[in-house]
A protein has these predicted regions:
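Intrinsic low-complexity/disordered segments
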Residues: 2, 7-8, 24, 54
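Generic short N-terminal amphipathic or hydrophobic helices
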Residues: 22-25, 45
Length: 234
């Protein structure tokens, strides 16, 4: 049944591409499995299994300054909980978790005078901030240029939703060694957990409905900084 569903889903996406006649942002394709794909023209047009609709921006949750304040607070909380930064290593979940980890790393370098080693994990296909498809994420690549054994590992992601991506990242870290602790830092926790996963550090708790989408925009990928609450209009 699952195989048949996947085949049907892929066929629908192929038809949508052809009917739309547009070039799509390949990097966003895996983030928008359920809600659809956005074209590069930036008009927010969405093509999905639920039909064709428009992503409507309901509210801006954080601007650039609010995000900086939240990440600075997370930086202080991480240092306080771990009694310094000497034993820390950071792992960003690509894509947006990676630059968030780098920003916190820069903050802690100012606070403690120590640069925390940073690595990254690439989780394939499904993202907790957008996907509602109940399939397990897969590890595409883990780039950890340090030994995790005995270290306090902090995982970073932009949005925490079902917890499936975080669980996959935890499993990836354990496949590389035996850390002392694994902690989770999240910019936005939108709720709706499907697994017993809880963030140790949260920039903002944001109650949402399942029809809504939390979009974190960073200049590295989006040309702007902010957190936005979106909804799919059919």
């Amino acid at each position: 049944m699952g195989r048949l569903y996947n085949a049907a889903r892929q066929q629908v996406f192929k038809l949508r591409y052809r009917d739309a006649g547009k070039i799509f942002d390949i990097e966003r394709r895996r983030r928008c499995v359920c809600f659809g794909m956005r074209d590069l023209a930036g008009n927010g047009r969405i093509f999905s299994l639920r039909g064709v609709g428009t992503m409507h921006q309901k509210a801006q949750i954080m601007d650039e300054n609010a995000m900086k304040r939240a990440l600075m607070r997370l930086s202080h909380e991480i240092v306080e909980k771990n009694k310094g930064a000497a034993n820390l290593v950071f792992v960003g979940i690509r894509r947006r978790g990676e630059p968030i980890a780098e920003r916190v790393c820069e903050n802690i370098a100012v606070i403690e005078g120590i640069r925390v080693p940073c690595g990254s994990i690439d989780i394939k296909f499904y993202r907790d901030d957008l996907s509602t498809v109940a399939e397990s994420p897969e590890i595409r690549k883990a780039s950890l240029p340090f030994d995790v054994n005995g270290r306090d590992v902090v995982l970073f992601d932009d949005v925490l939703y079902t917890g499936r991506t975080a669980r996959a990242a935890i499993e990836a870290v354990f496949s590389c060694g035996r850390p002392k602790t694994i902690q989770l830092a999240i910019l936005v926790d939108r709720g709706h957990r499907e697994l017993p996963i809880r963030a140790d550090y949260v920039g903002k708790n944001l109650p949402t409905s399942r029809s809504e989408l939390v979009e974190v925009r960073l200049p590295e990928f989006d040309g702007e900084t902010g957190v936005f609450l979106m909804d799919l209009e059919s």
